Amino acid sequence: MAVSRVLSLLATVASMALVIQETHFAAGADMGSCYDGVGRAQRCLPEFENAAFGRRAEASHTCGRPPEDFCPHVGAPGAGLQCQRCDDADPGRRHDASYLTDFHSPDDSTWWQSPSMAFGVQYPTSVNLTLSLGKAYEITYVRLKFHTSRPESFAIYKRTYASGPWEPYQYYSASCQKTYGRPEGHYLRPGEDERVAFCTSEFSDISPLNGGNVAFSTLEGRPSAYNFEESPVLQEWVTSTDILISLDRLNTFGDDIFKDPRVLQSYYYAVSDFSVGGRCKCNGHASECEPNAAGQLACRCQHNTTGVDCERCLPFFQDRPWARGTAEDANECLPCNCSGHSEECTFDRELYRSTGHGGHCQRCRDHTTGPHCERCEKNYYRWSPKTPCQPCDCHPAGSLSLQCDNSGVCPCKPTVTGWKCDRCLPGFHSLSEGGCRPCACNVAGSLGTCDPRSGNCPCKENVEGSLCDRCRPGTFNLQPHNPVGCSSCFCYGHSKVCSPAAGFQEHHIRSDFRHGAGGWQIRSMGVSKRPLQWSQSGLLLGLRGGEELSAPKKFLGDQRLSYGQPVILTLQVPPGGSPPPIQLRLEGAGLALSLRPSSLPSPQDTRQPRRVQLQFLLQETSEEAESPLPTFHFQRLLSNLTALSIWTSGQGPGHSGQVLLCEVQLTSAWPQRELAPPASWVETCLCPQGYTGQFCEFCALGYKREIPHGGPYANCIPCTCNQHGTCDPNTGICLCGHHTEGPSCERCMPGFYGNAFSGRADDCQPCPCPGQSACATIPESGDVVCTHCPPGQRGRRCESCEDGFFGDPLGLSGAPQPCRRCQCSGNVDLNAVGNCDPHSGHCLRCLYNTTGAHCEHCREGFYGSAVATRPVDKCAPCSCDLRGSVSEKTCNPVTGQCVCLPYVSGRDCSRCSPGFYDLQSGRGCQSCKCHPLGSLENKCHPKTGQCPCRPGVTGQACDRCQLGFFGFSIKGCRDCRCSPLGAASSQCHENSTCVCRPGFVGYKCDRCQDNFFLADGDTGCQECPTCYALVKEEAAKLKARLMLMEGWLQRSDCGSPWGPLDILQGEAPLGDVYQGHHLLQETRGTFLQQMVGLEDSVKATWEQLQVLRGHVHCAQAGAQKTCIQLAELEETLQSSEEEVLRAASALSFLASLQKGSSTPTNWSHLASEAQILARSHRDTATKIEATSERALLASNASYELLKLMEGRVASEAQQELEDRYQEVQAAQTALGIAVAEALPKAEKALATVKQVIGDAAPHLGLLVTPEAMNFQARGLSWKVKALEQKLEQKEPEVGQSVGALQVEAGRALEKMEPFMQLRNKTTAAFTRASSAVQAAKVTVIGAETLLADLEGMKLRSPLPKEQAALKKKAGSIRTRLLEDTKRKTKQAERMLGNAASLSSSTKKKSKEAELMSKDNAKLSRALLREGKQGYRHASRLASQTQATLRRASRLLLTSEAHKQELEEAKQVTSGLSTVERQIRESRISLEKDTKVLSELLVKLGSLGVHQAPAQTLNETQRALESLRLQLDSHGALHHKLRQLEEESARQELQIQSFEDDLAEIRADKHNLETILSSLPENCAS
């Protein structure tokens, strides 16, 4: 049943909508187009649509906020509930209002749901659903589809317009009266108000439980529904902008009364679809709606309508009232008819009623008016309706009415004329309300009638006034015949005010030629003069032309009174003729002018000659003038007329006959003499001040010509004599008095001063200057200043010397001294001021890097001749090398020699001294330390320090032999010449013997050992077969025999061992030197005596110094420097002592070599034994034939060879002795060099101590009285005295400190003595051990050599008996040799054992020394830190001292004591800067000692002003000296400093290179800019 009712209701709604649509549209009308096919307007409507689709609906209550459970009904009551959950935060469980108007699908339904009854949703609590349509719609139906059962009561409301009240549309309720107070089933009768909402219970049943529909038709039950277009009430009824669904009561089964939560959760509102059918309301004037510019939905209006709903006409379409479009009539808005003169109109209902056109035009243009702008405004007209309206423009004063006729002509008053009545009739002027007034112009000054508008008369050039009745300023004498009306005032240009002069009458200057030419002369072109042709009738004018008649003197001169008057020429012309062309020429005052006649007479046909007159007006306004002149210049020409001539150009071809000049008349004036017409053109001037005379031609009394002798045209100016005399009016020269002079008496005479312009007799007073010379007065103060002081003097009273001079000319500071020129050696700018002191003459602005009282010295940092004539020869910068100099800008001012660091030479300290190398910044150079024996000279490479070595010598100091060389001596080292095949190494022993490989023997390892032979291919020595063992045994026996023979030889008295020997050929070792021994012994003894003497001298000097130090009392005044010198000398002697010890060590090494060479070795004994053996062989030679002969021959050969060797060895010994002597001399030279090296150090240390003591003197006073800096310079001398007293008090403390320092130094030397002795002992032991080893090696080698020789003799002796004898002797010799070798070897072992013990002792002592050195290093670092702090403190004191000395120097320039203090302060700054640089360079390596530095800072911070500053300074000095010694050592710090200095030097060189490059670039840039500026403008681009 319910489904059938819903379907029937939907059918009813559909049929009703169809009826409405058919009612809205006529048959065949196109609903979507507003115009038909021919362009006629027709009703149009937007498409029918679901206005709710896609629009956002709002619900007052929605489930899921918070989440809740709901249990929908799925069957009959009592069936089980299947509960679900509504959660707005979960999209899958959300049921908000957006699901009301979305796309509705029965298969996948979405719905909006309210909270359940469990949350209080039940009557009287309502749930509202609101839908905003965005604009007015014409609603056809409203449809709701419920997801649950339909409510028991709900209502539909609507708004007719936005923000309007809610109006009920329909009520649905099973209790209409109870719930809404409305009867159920109400219906309307025709004529009743159809805007009534009905209430029905048709859709209030609980079934169906889901999917129930409710459809509401807006026109159902409305009687006028079928006449909708004629019913405004129903049109308003269906119009809605918003729809509201109010859900008021739920349908239940009645089980809710038990309040079961599960039951309550089953009752709620749920709507799955909310549809609103209708059209966008456009009143039949639009076919579509779209968003406007504001984003609001609006109709796209047609039919000249506008508005959101097309509810009104456009502004200019108001010709009929707006109406809704119907099927019969589209009711298009029509435009207003404004005749094209307006675009604005309004609807005028009264006009529409009377005329049928309601458009009333507004703001008509083009001067139109009327409802349709159809006529002209008042006082406008137009020729025809198509032409625009034009203003009448009738003159309000001249017209009778402002309205004109259709042609635009205005009605005029009398005396007024014109199209617009805007001008006066001729002879009238000044149009006004009363008409026009008649003109009254002056005839003499006007040129015609007056201006009809203003009434002003047209005046002549020099006339003014509305009636032209007065002359302009600067003119006078108004005359009718004057073309300009009035004549200009002349007055010689001094006045513009003049008037006619009284007492003058008219006068004529005339020539009538009755009695002759009257002084006239004629001149033709190219001819100076010619005779005149005169007759009683006149002068005959030439017919050829180019003739000029010159007037006599009476016409010339001052003719100013003829200005403006005519010159009349009377001519007699032939019958019927006319006068020829004639011009009047005027000359004067350097000007010239030609005039033509003002009028020419017309020719007359007469048969008699007739007279005619030609008139020339003497006025600049004459139109006939050629090259007219200004007024003033014209009158100036007349004032000095020098020529008046008549120039004829000849008669033309039409002229014939004679022309006679009958009369010439010039009108002028002169003073009144008789009755005659007055000459009103003569002026009298009103002269300004300073002028007088009728024409202002004279200067008044007290005035003069501005230009002397300038004449009347020159201006007059007051006499400028300043009341000290009078002046001539023409020259202006003053006759001065009162001691004044000048053209205007404007100045006092020389020797007088004052203000001559005051005009009093005592203006000028005598000058108070030397010799009453000239002076002047300062205007501001009135002081008198002398202006012509004697040469070299200046000042107000010449009391001081001129710039560049000095002296005291007036004796203001003592006896007068004349001013003398300052002598600045030509080193000042003569154009500058303040070059020297005006009192002392000391130069103040020295140029060219000079200084001194007379600029006679070079400034610090420069050197040269300050008095040289050329600037280029003057002082040049020191340019000291930063690496080798103490300061970059400190050098000898004359020679330029820089103050070099130790062992640095060169003018700029750029290279090391000979014997030194490695120039480093702040340190200087270090000694080459070239070995005196191994080097050629005590010079080395300046960078690497490599010494020039002797042959075979190597090492940086040339202190060792090269590999493969031996015998280090004065000649170098000799080549070992070891056999490359047999020697194990190319290096040999000091005795030249080589180390042999197995199987090789010999000094040079150049032969095979016994029982060995040289293998094939020279690959080495191989052992012989076993058969040669017998030979070896025999050789052993021979060696034993030789040993016996040696013992026998040593026991017997064989005489001198130096006799000739018969030995085998071989090379003697180095130690086998046996001749010249006594010479070497004597030389060595002498040298040792000299060294002992030198040592005694040093000790004696030291004792004398100790005694001298004991006698000198350092506490006495002035002895401080002496003590410092002694301390420095002590250090120098200590350094010298060290050098002597090093030299003694070297000499001991030489002595050991000499000892080894002075005593005969075992080889000598062997040689003696070989000689005895040879003699024995010679005695038995007769018994052994062949063998003896061969042995004898071998012995003799050996003897001869020995003799040769004897001579060579002797010569070598002598040469080596000389070499040793040279070595001694070289050692002595090296000792001298060492002393020379130590001397600069001592001098530098002495200078440093002096400087520190000198620096401390001014600082001690500041340390005790730090507040002294606050006093003025007046008490500086007292402070100096106080400082001297303090210095005297502190000097004993300084002396004690120095003594303590000396004691410490002595103790340090005493501590070093055991180490020195230990070193000497170690060196001696090492030398003895080395000598012993070498001697043993030589002995063994000698024995082996002798054995080899004897075995060779055996090979050459084949007889068995001889071999046996030789073998026996050789065996004895060998035995003796072996015993001796063992003995020498044991002795060497004992010596080496002692050396080992000494070496261990030395090592132990060395460790102790190392520990002590570390302690000393720590102490040195601590002292260094104290020195740094002291240096900083001293720096502050130095800066304070400098400031004080600078103030004192400025205030007391003449104080020599203060100047000396200033120089000392500068020396302090220089010394401290050096120390600062040294400390800064050492800072990196001393960073680990910060702890001790902190302790020292605390100590110094607690130091008060009453503590002994001298002790602190002495400690600082010791620390600095310790630092210097540490830097001089060759440790890691020295290495690092050297690396840093080298890197700094490289960087400085690179920076200097960059600066040089930059300077070159700047110079090139400057040159290019100069070239560019010198180029022409066209080339520069």
Curated annotation (Swiss-Prot):
PROSITE patterns tied to this protein: EGF_1 (PS00022), EGF_2 (PS01186), EGF_LAM_1 (PS01248), EGF_LAM_2 (PS50027), LAMININ_IVA (PS51115), LAMININ_NTER (PS51117)
Residues glycosylated per entry: N128, N304, N337, N640, N849, N991, N1162, N1196, N1320, N1514
**Keyword Repeat listed:** yes
All copies of domain Laminin EGF-like, residue ranges? 280-335, 336-391, 392-438, 439-488, 489-498, 685-718, 719-766, 767-821, 822-877, 878-927, 928-975, 976-1024
As annotated in Swiss-Prot or TrEMBL, what is the tissue specificity of this protein? Strongly expressed in capillaries and arterioles of kidney as well as in interstitial Leydig cells of testis.
Domain topic, free-text comment? The alpha-helical domains I and II are thought to interact with other laminin chains to form a coiled coil structure.
Function (record text): Binding to cells via a high affinity receptor, laminin is thought to mediate the attachment, migration and organization of cells into tissues during embryonic development by interacting with other extracellular matrix components.
Please report the name of this protein according to its UniProt entry. Answer: Laminin subunit gamma-3
Q: From what organism does this protein derive?
A: Mus musculus (Mouse)
Q: What is the lineage of its organism?
A: Eukaryota, Metazoa, Chordata, Craniata, Vertebrata
